[in-house]
Design a protein with these regions (language model features):
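Active-site groove signature of glycoside hydrolases
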Residues: 89-110
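Active-site mouth loops of central-metabolism enzymes
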Residues: 1-19, 69-80, 108-111, 205-217
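N-terminal binding-site loop/beta-alpha segment at the start of enzyme catalytic domains
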Residues: 1-64, 121, 127
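Acidic (Asp/Glu)-rich catalytic clusters
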Residues: 29-30, 52-63, 86-95, 126, ...
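Distinct, well-ordered alpha-helical segments
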Residues: 46-57, 78-89, 109-120, 140-153
Length: 259
């Protein structure tokens, strides 16, 4: 979710619309979906506390799965990681995270995580039961991901950018990155399936006309279903920010049929 806001812009800073978030959370859970994603830096920390108020305080812990992330901006050395992690648990109001990611890894950032023994620290937290599954989110070339997965076999899953527009973007290396995940048999979470909304509400008129003529759903539905149809993918983050978008997502993902 890109949380709805009372002030500021969606995806930026400001005051979160907690009433609207609660309605979206309830609708999402009522229809059998469970996965919620946050990070310490999202909305200057308000994303984590919104999860606490709208999700954790209002629903049984075993009714949802919650993801948080170790973001490089908030720690400098290994000794900083555990206090940051405990702060994240407190902000979210939970005693463990179902999923925890090394956030936005690039070649340069991976070297820092590796030299600072961040992987060892997060693995220790997992052994203590405070993390159920450890993964990474990734923003670099395929050869970098290959190196990371070879050197860190304890990684359980990988979050990557994957959408139908990026097939022509050599900077993203969409298919090569995906193929590395397949090579190492790592389940994939997709981020940016709608490329920041470009494949949802900002399509060129000609492309929008082609999709509308198919009468098979909204433009966003094609983008999200395209990502969800890939065999290695087990989760797609849709970035919905309104109740209407949540209802649209549910309409084609509740009884999902691959494209």
């Amino acid at each position: 979710m890109r949380l709805p806001m009372l002030t500021g812009e969606v995806g930026g800073s400001g005051e979160v619309d907690l009433e609207q978030v609660s309605k979206m959370v309830d609708l999402f859970l009522d229809n059998g979906f469970t996965y919620f994603d946050t990070a310490h830096g999202y909305i200057s920390g308000s994303s984590e506390t919104a999860m606490r108020e709208c999700l954790v305080k209002r629903h049984p812990r075993d009714s949802f799965t919650l993801t948080d992330k170790l973001t490089g901006n908030y720690w400098q050395k290994q000794e900083d990681i555990r206090p940051l992690f405990e702060k994240q648990l407190e902000a979210c109001g939970v005693t463990y995270f179902d999923y925890y990611l090394m956030h936005a890894l690039t070649n340069e950032l991976y070297d820092r995580y590796k030299s600072s023994h961040a992987f060892e620290e997060v693995l220790a937290l997992k052994k203590e039961g405070k993390i159920r599954h450890m993964g990474i989110s990734f923003h670099d070339k395929a050869y970098v991901l290959d190196r990371i997965l070879k050197e860190q076999p304890e990684i359980e899953y990988v979050q990557i950018q994957y959408n139908y527009r990026d097939i022509t973007d050599s900077g993203v290396e969409r298919d090569k990155v995906y193929d590395v995940c397949v090579k190492y048999n790592k389940p994939v979470i997709v981020m940016e399936p709608c490329k920041g909304g470009a494949l949802a509400d900002r399509l060129p008129d000609q492309a929008k006309g082609i999709l509308n003529a198919l009468h098979g759903g909204s433009p966003a539905s094609y983008a999200i279903r395209f990502a969800a149809s890939q065999p290695q993918v087990f989760m797609v983050l849709s970035g919905m920010s309104t109740l209407e978008q949540a209802q649209d997502n549910i309409s084609y993902m509740k009884d999902f049929k691959p494209l």
